[in-house]
Amino acid sequence: MANRINLNATSYHGAGAIAEIANEAKAHGFKKAFVCSDPDLIKFNVTSKVTDILTANGLDYELYSDIKPNPTIENVKHGVEAFKASGADYLIAIGGGSSMDTSKAIGIIIANPEFEDVRSLEGTAPTKNPCVPIIAVPTPAGTAAEVTINYVITDVERKRKFVCVDPHDMPIIAVVDPDMMSSMPKGLTASTGMDALTHAIEGYTTKAAWEMTDMFHLKAIELISKSLRGAVANTKEGREGMALGQYIAGMGFSNVGLGIAHSMAHTLGAVYDTPHGVACAMMLPIVMEYNQECTGEKYREIARAMGVTGVDEMSQEEYRKAAIDAVKKLSADVGIPSVLEAVKEEDLQFLADSAHADACAPGNPKDASVEDLKDLFRKIMA
């Protein structure tokens, strides 16, 4: 069987990388940008770091900010209408997964108008045309949406999130500039960083993992583990390490999928509006404990990548526990809670059914039943 890798046509990394946006826009002959960014980034003058560059280079743009942290079907509909009215010919996504997922959905629907209802794109989307060109500029280090073929939309009416998988939505250019991440709050840095670690660990242990993605994921685990605490403290080294680590994780998991930590996190986000990274961080060690019997020696390498010493002398039980404990400690060190008070016993059936139906669930190394998922959700109850 052939293994596929989809990546950006071009990516820029390092402090000051956003200066390349104007050069790329001119080189591609773009006329007007549709800039997607959430209201907080606009309020705190993060978005303006990019729009000021556009203005200085005589590049026209229109700003769209009707974006929620868990972007909704309505956000996408309004975005499609606004894009059509704008006269823009490319998108610039500035922010985290919310801005990028909204941009991807807009770009796909504009290029494939037969899929006007974004719900029709759930799962492996059958589009024929590449989306409107996207230049993606992440601000938190975590989602890696700038280098993935996935986007996640919330169906508020049905209280669920759905995943769309489509190589046509890949941004043509990713600009990963740690300076864009320096103004992010500590809590957001922590939660998105744990999302990145979840990407790396789930991608490493998923059923579809192979040698190249294993290489990506182990390096990502190493970088994230040694950088996240520093990033939360807003050190230069921490921000730079997280910027690279989360991107490398995206290079991997986008091409092999994830597991039930993500399917459960999607459900928590849809039902309780739990921040995605917080939900991932809560579920990751619980799911690792559940999956451990189906992971061979991979937890030994996870423990090693996370800085645990003496793993070669450990028994299977010891190195698996060491890997899980390292994840728990990192999560606690950056202030992530381990319980979610909103979860009630009467919610468990709906939560488990939704997580079981999520597109990420089949990739889990251990097949999880609805009853298994109920038991796992129970572990985060207060």
Regions found by a protein language model. Give the residues of each.
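An N-terminal, well-structured beta->alpha segment
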Residues: 1-64
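Short glycine/serine/threonine-rich phosphate/pyrophosphate-binding segments
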Residues: 18-21, 43-46, 73-76, 99-103, ...
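N-terminal small/polar loop signature for handling phosphorylated ligands or for N-terminal nucleophile
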Residues: 42-115, 229-239
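C-terminal charged capping/lid subdomain of soluble metabolic enzymes
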Residues: 299, 303, 309-382
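Catalytic phosphate/nucleotide-handling subdomain of diverse soluble enzymes
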Residues: 267-306
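Glycine/threonine-rich beta-strand-loop-alpha-helix active-site module
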Residues: 74-179
